[in-house]
Amino acid sequence: MSAQLIDGNALAKQIRSEAAVRAARLTERGHQPGLAVVLVGEDPASQVYVRNKVKACEDNGFHSSLDRYPADLSEAELLARIDALNNDPKIHGILVQLPLPKHIDSHKVLEAIAPEKDVDGFHVANAGALMTGAPLFRPCTPYGCMKMLESISYPLRGARAVVVGASNIVGKPMAMLLLQAGATVTICNSKTRDIGAHTRDADVIVAAVGKRNLITADMVKPGAVVIDVGMNRDDNGKLCGDVDFAGVREVAGYITPVPGGVGPMTITMLLINTLEAAERAAG
């Protein structure tokens, strides 16, 4: 029997609709939620991501500004722009699109964003707060994954969860959110000897590596929930995830597709973080 799909597009639409209502209420009070997106350079993928984020804002009643800069922008100039955005009362969230050109220190730039406007959740203050269970903002992709699990009313308390991938953006915060929900969590990284030995016992698998067909049917327990964060291209140039979708869907209980799974949820949770920042600022 095939796994049930967790439809990220449908869930994102529902959450965005609710966010638009909250945004309209704030706007009526003179506090329209505002997101500033900063793009440095001409990376094609980054341009697509940025365009999608700006459109999502505009479609749901948010104010958005897009600052595009050439790849030779100096680090000092970028930091000065972030400082100006930190002090702009119409901007509640600041997002610097990664990757940045090599001559710019990404860590320094992310740390320059005011924690109360760090809607990506990457600032060390927010990362630390996530560890203690009281974050201002949850990183958007893990937050979206948790919403997907919530949408199927999955009982995480006591469940065995395996996160494949240990990045600061997805893997580590994902593990923390699962831990806080009561799951017993294992993180697999590039040094893990036998990933399948861990995933075969898992009730929930989150694959976030960026390697096509990393998770195959023989690595999945029947009935498990499989969340695919990966974004890759197959031999025909079609988008695919880290999971062998055709094979794994015959074993899993629930599975997210690529595209149409985690991707739409990431941008949706960016809107939610921006909305919450605006609500806090409005009082």
Curated annotation (Swiss-Prot):
Its EC number is 1.5.1.5, 3.5.4.9. NADP(+) binds at residues 165-167, 190. It catalyses: (6R)-5,10-methylene-5,6,7,8-tetrahydrofolate + NADP(+) = (6R)-5,10-methenyltetrahydrofolate + NADPH; (6R)-5,10-methenyltetrahydrofolate + H2O = (6R)-10-formyltetrahydrofolate + H(+). Coiled coil: none annotated. PROSITE patterns: THF_DHG_CYH_1, THF_DHG_CYH_2. It holds the Pfam family THF_DHG_CYH. Gene3D superfamilies: Leucine Dehydrogenase, chain A, domain 1, NAD(P)-binding Rossmann-like Domain. One of its GO terms (biological process) is tetrahydrofolate interconversion. Pathway: One-carbon metabolism; tetrahydrofolate interconversion. One of its GO terms (cellular component) is cytosol. It comes from the Bacteria. One of its GO terms (molecular function) is methenyltetrahydrofolate cyclohydrolase activity. Keywords: Amino-acid biosynthesis, Histidine biosynthesis, Hydrolase, Methionine biosynthesis, Multifunctional enzyme, NADP, One-carbon metabolism, Oxidoreductase, Purine biosynthesis. Disulfide bonds: none annotated. Transmembrane segments: none annotated. CDD domains: NAD_bind_m-THF_DH_Cyclohyd. Homodimer. Catalyzes the oxidation of 5,10-methylenetetrahydrofolate to 5,10-methenyltetrahydrofolate and then the hydrolysis of 5,10-methenyltetrahydrofolate to 10-formyltetrahydrofolate. Belongs to the tetrahydrofolate dehydrogenase/cyclohydrolase family. HAMAP family: THF_DHG_CYH (MF_01576). This is Bifunctional protein FolD. It comes from Cupriavidus pinatubonensis (strain JMP 134 / LMG 1197) (Cupriavidus necator (strain JMP 134)). The gene is folD.
